[in-house]
UniProtKB/Swiss-Prot annotation:
Homotetramer. It comes from Leishmania tarentolae (Sauroleishmania tarentolae). The keyword Oxidoreductase applies. One of its GO terms (molecular function) is pteridine reductase activity. The keyword Ribonucleoprotein does not apply. Substrate binds at S176. The active site is at Y195 (proton acceptor). This is Pteridine reductase 1.
Length: 289
């Protein structure tokens, strides 16, 4: 089977592994052509693209960009271009979809840095230890807010500008943006204050962008998973404490359960839904410690 020239196109950030790869595969299975963004996981992204292209030729590409550090992030593509600003790097991701397929119908803002920044721990700049592998809380702030809030804002802006510019040619096209928020905006994990702040900003962006972009028939929604496919370095004690608080099944959400909601929000069945955030957390956000 080959990709139809009219197949809808989805840009998924952080698509190389874990939840992002599951979302990308689910969209591909629904007939989407996918642009797989990655930061450091080049091998994983290439493997996923090869798998998807084997199923349907010319249905997946990979594009690398650092969306996390506002001040120093880099960007590389095969042509060697190096846009400097975060907005230009975000625009380049959207442009890649148009260069390859002439359209971009869906944007999934999934890329995310995630680690604790305890308020009572001294960072390196205060004579204490570093925050994760970061040298200071200032760098952590640029990283966490860059990937979780600022880059999504710029990606939405670039996406919407392209829609506005091509509206006449793409008349009748349905557009959808899905922001991957977090159930922690309702009940934070201890020590993850800065991450929670950034995800709160993303949830606010979801509502504000939905209002502003409705005139272009761009729907903007959020999905708030609980802990799903976890990073390798998350302490087991944190995972166990989380699962203990989940009313439904006392477990993490699966990648497939989260991806199913993303697919729904991108589908015609959700054509009258915008500005909402759906929790996929087994009721975690309803509980208190």
């Amino acid at each position: 089977m080959t990709t139809s020239p009219t197949a809808p196109v989805a840009l998924v950030t952080g698509a190389a592994k874990r939840l992002g790869s599951s979302i990308a595969e689910a969209l591909h299975a629904e007939g989407y052509t996918v642009c797989l963004h990655y930061h450091r996981s080049a091998a994983d992204a290439s493997t996923l693209a090869a798998t998807l292209n084997a199923r349907r030729p010319n249905s997946a590409i990979t594009v690398q960009a650092d969306l996390s550090n506002v001040a120093t992030a880099s960007f590389s593509e095969t042509d060697g271009s190096v846009p400097v600003t975060l907005f230009s790097r975000c625009s380049a991701l959207v442009d890649a979809c148009y260069m390859h397929w002439g359209r971009c119908d869906v944007l999934v803002n999934n890329a995310s840095s995630f680690y604790p920044t305890p308020l009572l721990r001294k960072d390196a700049g205060e004579g204490g230890s570093s925050v994760g592998d970061k040298e200071s809380l200032e760098v952590a702030a640029a990283d966490l807010f860059g990937s979780n809030a600022i880059a999504p804002y710029f990606l939405i802006k670039a996406f919407a500008q392209r829609v506005a510019d091509t509206r006449a040619e793409q008349r009748g096209t349905s557009y959808s943006i899905v922001n991957m928020v977090d159930a922690m905006t309702s009940q934070p994990l201890l020590g993850y204050t800065m991450y929670t702040m950034a995800k709160e900003a993303l949830e606010g962006l979801t509502r504000s962008a939905a209002l502003e972009l409705a005139s272009l028939q761009i729907r903007v929604n959020g999905v708030s998973p609980g802990l799903s496919v976890l990073p390798d370095d998350m302490p087991f004690s944190v995972q166990e404490d989380y699962r203990r608080k989940v009313p439904l099944y006392q477990r993490n959400s699966s990648a497939e359960e989260v991806s199913d909601v993303v697919i729904f929000l991108c589908s015609p069945k959700a054509k009258y839904i915008t500005g909402t955030c759906i929790k996929v957390d087994g009721g975690y956000s309803l509980t208190r410690a």
